[in-house]
Amino acid sequence: MAISSIEHRSGWYDIFDARGKKAKTIPDYIGELLGWSDRFFIVMKGSYYDTYDEQGKKIKSIPTFIGNFVSICADQFIVRKGSYLDTYDAWGKKISSRVAK
């Protein structure tokens, strides 16, 4: 199942699949939704970024000291730390780093 959208309503996040059908509902106390791709989504709770799969199952907790969240795409997300943009996968493995423009 691919994620097409995630909507926040009354203490819950509704996860919709590629056909626009509600696939899963999870409580919003998991954290503040930062973004999603078709494969996973990321929330911030306290001093951690938590990644979740399309079924709402936690993949990994990653400390926020890696940088400030910028964007998410496919199975990767980007954070900005100082003058660098670092790319991580959903499991918290750093893939690449480059100077931000």
Q: Across the structure, where does each feature detected by a protein language model lie?
A:
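Short beta-strand elements that form the blades of beta-propeller/WD-repeat-like
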Residues: 1-8, 34-45, 70-81
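Surface-exposed loop/turn elements that mediate protein-protein interactions on large endomembrane-trafficking
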Residues: 10-27, 49-64, 87-101
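Short, exposed beta-strand-loop hairpins at the edges of beta-sheets
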Residues: 77-80, 84-91
